[in-house]
Amino acid sequence: MDIKLKDFEGPLDLLLHLVSKYEVDIYDVPIVDIIEQYLAYIATLQAMKLEVAGEYMVMASQLMLIKSRKLLPKVVETIEAEEDPELQLLHQIEEYRTYKLLGEELALKHNERAQRFSKPKLELIYDDITLKQDKTVLDVFLAFSKVMAEKQEEIKNSHTTIKSDDYRIEDIMTVVEEQVIRQKETNLSWFFKRAGSLNEIITIFLAALELIKVHRVYVKQEHNFDDIILRKESA
């Protein structure tokens, strides 16, 4: 089974998604938290042996610089707005959001005009392998990134040897689905916490995504940053 995750449209698209989860003004977001989530996302892609585009790595290095400045003791210094990397980043995100909203509005008007003056196309395009990048999948992936970061830290601080186990996605899909059927709904974190290795966590994640993709389980999240809940019926 080959599962691929489409990239965001770019690093700013990923940052905008992370910022929007806080539902506050861009300039009021906890920038260090945003940076840590971004870096966890990149680290997770690398742990899963997925290719990370160069532009994401360039942004990661810029974010690490901003984070280090935020965590260092305060030094009295005057920084011009155009030289402040944090402020520059927030300006970039705000500008990207403006253009993205404008693009979505233009696309909507184009579709409305096309429907008014032409017959609808009967062509349907299916993509059986690549998971489409929607909010549900993104939120599941971000929740997974957080767990991966915690598990990697746990293993790093442990003196035990983790054996390399082989986990089949199809087998884990059955385990996840049977648990959801029994309990009606189960937190995704419930499965992660019971995993004994990074390999098992990765397989659980891929199994959950595949179940969501084929509509054998559905996702519920009451509020941003709440646990991801897997359920048998759509909300």
From Swiss-Prot:
It is found in: Cytoplasm. The keyword Cell cycle applies. It comes from the Bacteria. GO terms for biological process: cell division; chromosome segregation; DNA replication. The keyword Cytoplasm applies. HAMAP family: ScpA (MF_01805). Participates in chromosomal partition during cell division. May act via the formation of a condensin-like complex containing Smc and ScpB that pull DNA away from mid-cell into both cell halves. This is Segregation and condensation protein A. It comes from Streptococcus mutans serotype c (strain ATCC 700610 / UA159).
